[in-house]
UniProtKB/Swiss-Prot annotation:
Binds 2 calcium ions per subunit. Binds 1 zinc ion per subunit. Residues 1-20, 323-342 are annotated as: Disordered. Pfam families: Peptidase_M43. This is Ulilysin. One of its GO terms (biological process) is proteolysis. It comes from Methanosarcina acetivorans (strain ATCC 35395 / DSM 2834 / JCM 12185 / C2A). It is an enzyme of class 3 (hydrolase). Optimum pH is 7.5. Monomer. Belongs to the peptidase M43B family. Metalloprotease which in vitro specifically cleaves IGFBP-2 to -6, insulin, and extracellular matrix proteins but not IGFBP-1 or IGF2. Shows a preference for substrates with an arginine in the P1' position, the first position downstream of the scissile bond. Consists of two subdomains separated by an active site cleft containing the catalytic zinc ion.
């Protein structure tokens, strides 16, 4: 594998955590767009998302969607083999963030408080493996590879990683120590948007940005990298819009109507209001999970993002709804409070 990486100009792994958030999801997305089948799948997915945005499904589901997770820990040095407690801390954060139960949601300026969404999704470590055997929902693989890239090597045992579990039954999360873009830039994680190959479906996160304890390091030690990347896995774009065909950054869109137009990603912890694209007086919604701010400053999804996620759950991720319905035949379904339609 070393020769392959060096041919791209990446000579050695760095143990430094990036000081600013960088995500490789769009790099993976643009690579997959070279495939005609992926383009067709994405067109169908976006057409459904547009219908939902236009009111095709005005009222969201009441039942909680519960998604089984398998965490593949791929480690080289012993300290990279993160603890069960660190993994559980990440699951706990996801269940707060996707249910609007995070205490720091109070940071949202009052002008946007009515937009904060409960996405109605909960996550749990899988209790059965693909063969029906009991499992902790965690796999552990020691590797000789010292770093991985957005080319998905971590997702295959043949290249030093671990093979995915069936993507229609589990959310696969790979955790590794060092992760780089194709040009050698250190990144915190990346996700594959719905519509791509099943064998690479899921998210990848470095251990320094995973969970809230153990190897997690500030400013990415609040578990929000996984929240951000799973947002992509559920078909959310970056809040500033990612389309490269527009020279004017203010012409890009995240395909969500209630997120203000903004020019570029925000980093660190901006002061409110932070104005761009003539979006004053309130400015950028930089506290949104789909921006690039530090963990402690991203605290919300919007109702429009929830609608887009619902389209994803009814479309390319619908297998998880079927599993919820099967489970709930045996027990009373969990419910959530829904906002009144406006």
């Amino acid at each position: 594998m070393a020769e392959k990486f060096e041919s791209r100009g990446i000579e050695e792994a760095s143990s430094e955590v990036p000081t600013q958030r960088r995500c490789g999801a769009m790099e993976v997305h643009h690579r997959l767009l070279r495939s005609a089948s992926y383009v067709r799948e994405r067109d169908q997915i976006e057409n459904l998302a547009l219908k939902y945005k236009q009111g095709f499904r005005a009222i969201s589901r009441m039942e909680i969607v519960k998604i089984p997770v398998v965490v593949h820990v791929v480690w080289n040095e012993e300290e990279e083999n993160i603890s069960d407690a660190q993994i559980q801390s990440q699951i706990d954060i996801l269940n707060k963030d996707f249910r609007k139960l995070n205490s720091d949601v109070s940071q949202v300026p009052s002008v946007w408080s009515n937009l904060i969404a409960d996405l109605g999704i909960e996550f749990f470590l899988a209790t059965k493996d693909p063969n029906g055997n009991q499992t902790t929902g965690i796999t552990r693989t020691q590797t000789s590879v010292t770093f991985f890239t957005t080319s998905d090597e971590v997702k295959f045992a043949s290249s030093g990683g671990e093979d995915a579990w069936p993507a229609d039954r589990y959310l696969n999360i790979w955790v590794c120590h060092v992760l780089k873009s194709e040009i050698g830039q250190d990144i915190l994680g990346y996700a594959q948007f719905p519509g791509g190959p099943a064998e690479t479906d899921g998210v990848v996160i470095v251990d320094a940005a995973f969970g809230t304890t153990g190897t997690a390091l500030p400013p990415f030690d609040k578990g929000r990298t996984a929240t951000h990347e799973i947002g992509h896995w559920l078909n959310l774009y970056h809040i500033w819009g990612d389309e490269l065909r527009f020279e004017d950054p203010c012409s890009r869109s995240d395909e969500v109507d209630d997120t203000p137009n903004q020019a570029d990603p925000n980093f660190g912890c901006p002061s409110y209001p932070h104005v761009s694209c003539s979006n004053g007086p309130n400015g950028d919604m930089f506290m949104n999970y789909m921006d690039y701010v530090d963990d402690k400053c991203m605290v919300m999804f919007t109702q429009g993002q929830a609608t887009r996620v619902n389209a994803c759950l009814d479309g390319p991720r619908s297998s998880f709804l079927a599993r919820v319905e099967e489970t709930e035949k045996k027990e009373a379904p969990s419910k959530r409070e829904m906002p009144m339609p406006r």
